[in-house]
């Protein structure tokens, strides 16, 4: 079974080797047919502390690393500075 992969934006990097990633999803309400946006935060392992808030990253499922971390950052794109 393949591992799940999600795409999101880093919202926090305050803990060592960990980033908090916000993943947005969209779906249509089954009765009202309105498009609804929902988001969820995931704690992901960032071994080299290379990602900062605003960076786009892809995270992948892994075995539990700590109490909250079950995802690992596999790749990312750094936010372009102005």
From Swiss-Prot:
The keyword Ribosomal protein applies. Keywords: Ribonucleoprotein, Ribosomal protein, RNA-binding, rRNA-binding. One of its GO terms (molecular function) is structural constituent of ribosome. It comes from the Bacteria. Signal peptide: none annotated. GO terms for biological process: translation. GO terms for cellular component: cytosolic small ribosomal subunit. PROSITE patterns: RIBOSOMAL_S17. InterPro entries: NA-bd_OB-fold, Ribosomal_uS17, Ribosomal_uS17_bact/chlr, Ribosomal_uS17_CS. NCBIfam families: PRK05610.1, uS17_bact. Belongs to the universal ribosomal protein uS17 family. One of the primary rRNA binding proteins, it binds specifically to the 5'-end of 16S ribosomal RNA. Part of the 30S ribosomal subunit. HAMAP family: Ribosomal_uS17_B (MF_01345_B). This is Small ribosomal subunit protein uS17. It comes from Bradyrhizobium diazoefficiens (strain JCM 10833 / BCRC 13528 / IAM 13628 / NBRC 14792 / USDA 110). The gene is rpsQ.
